[in-house]
Amino acid sequence: MIMKKLLITIWRDQVAPRFDLTSEVLVATVDSTGEVLTSKTVVLPSVSAEDLCHMVLTEGITTVICGGIEEEYFQYLTWKKVTVIDSVIGPYDRALEFARGGRLEPGAILTG
């Protein structure tokens, strides 16, 4: 069974507007049917794009969903074979819903 491990940068109930200023993330494992198998919210000990990239790699994240992300981090993550869906605006639960169904695209504006 193919599984995806998603990381969504969050701020309150929204996708965080900036990757490099994220202090909280949602990590979810989704199976090939779109069912969420595990989900956890992680409060990061510090705000750091480098630390967040390290977490993405050590946790085996396959897809990052975020608002704005600097080109340097976007290129690094894609070079490491992580899919980055950026410029997403809206509630993070809607982003997860769309990602589960394979319908989330960069630049998506989601309504609550």
Question: Across the structure, where does each feature detected by a protein language model lie?
Answer:
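Non-catalytic interface/targeting segments
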Residues: 1-47, 51, 55-59, 78-79, ...
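Acidic/His-rich segments in extracytoplasmic proteins that coordinate ligands and/or metal ions
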Residues: 62-84
